Structure formats: structure tokens, C-alpha cells
Amino acid sequence: MTGQSSHLRNLAVRTHLGPAQSLTVGFGTLGSKTMLVRAIGPALAAFGLRDLLPDPTIALYDAAAAKIDENNDWNPALAHLFVDVGAFALTSGSTDAALLRACNGTSTARIAGPGAGVVLVEVYDVGGPGRLVNAAARNLVGTGQNSLLAGLVVDGTAAKTLLIRGVGARLADFGVTGGLADPKLEIYDAACAKIAENDSWNVQLQPLAGSVGAFDLTPGSRDTALLLTLAPGPYTAQISGIGATAGEVLFEL
């Protein structure tokens, strides 16, 4: 959603990928933006995480679903950009992935193995006249380490109003089977304090969803949505399954 003095600066998604699974992360820019996309597995060991995706790959697609870039092992020439955008350093020679690409409109990054494990996907605004306006991620999620964690940063001097959704059951209408029947959405601030949560949605949000280009949710469904006004700073959204359930879920911002 729009704001005069604030904007989305970056997005990060952490989840667990099973064998032969992929994580889809979409983002939209209004105008041309240079974006840095990273898929990190081995480097997460430095933060105490285990069961990591050993060799993540990134494939980047445009709005016409044409592949426009891909990467397996990151190029050390990008290391200075990591510092510029505030990203943590990667170990030289690691099998993490990263690519730099000018994007305009809707782009989709698909992250896959080989193998299985936890992966962190990051999308950074590096520069350009446009702005990052929305983001989404879809994956099979459950509880605990199998929850989907999405980090976002609101940049600027004013608060920004965001519509945040976790969609499970509605995905069946788009040919996606096994949608998470009852997703729960929790939002945390920079101090890890929970500031909002929901496991349903209010039908009064339906017109608002249409105004920002989001598809309608089915009245009475157990999909979840929150409308929040957030001050500048970092936030984390967590999506998990109620009652230790698992299934495909779409996170939208």
C-alpha cells in the first residue's frame, strides 16, 4: 500500500525445504529497481541454525514467466554490495547463491536444492528510481522450524499501512492442492515483541484487497489477514498451522 514518506526496503523469508521442494518468492516494483537476491543455506550455520540447505540455487523470472537470470554459487564481486545494503557477509567459496538484477514490475525468484534443509531468501533494494511495492512467498509450512518466517523493513520518516495475508484454503482455486487449512499469522517488532496476530480475516478487508491488486478471499474461509500501520523499522511475520497442521501457504505483503 502507498505512503508518501515511507516505503518497503527489503524482504527476507526463512523456511525449510524438503527434498524436491522449491520456495517461490515474488516481488513487485513500481518503476525500475536494481535488486539483490540471495539464497542462503550454509552461511546460516554461523547463527546457530542446523539442517541447512547445502547448495541453494536461484532462478529469477519476469512477469511473462521467462527466466531472466539464475545463480548457483555467489560471485565474490558482489561482496561490497552486501555491506552497502546491510546484509551479513558470506564466506568466500561457500555454496550460497546471490544475483544482482534490474527489475521492473513483477518478478519471481524460485529457490531449490539439491537436498533439503533450512534456507533464507533475501531481496534487497539496491537503487534506482522505482520502489518496492509488494512481496509474496509460497511454500509448504507447518509448525516450529517448519513455520514460514518473513522479515520486512519499513524505511522512511512516516508510518506505513500494510495489508498482510496468509492464504491456504483459497489456493485450491488456483490449482494448488494441500493448502494449509487454518494458517496463523503473527507479527513481531525489532525487540521480538508480538504486536499483532490473527488466524482469520475480516470481510471488511475485501474491498481493500481489490484496491491493491490482491485476489478476493472466500467469505468464511480460515485464511488470515491483518491491516497494520507500522512505524519505520524492521518487523517479522510468522505463519504456522493451527493445531500442528501443515500445508501450502501463500504469504502476501
Task: Identify what each model region corresponds to.
Residues M1-L253:
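A sequence-level detector for low-complexity, Ser/Thr- and acidic-rich stretches
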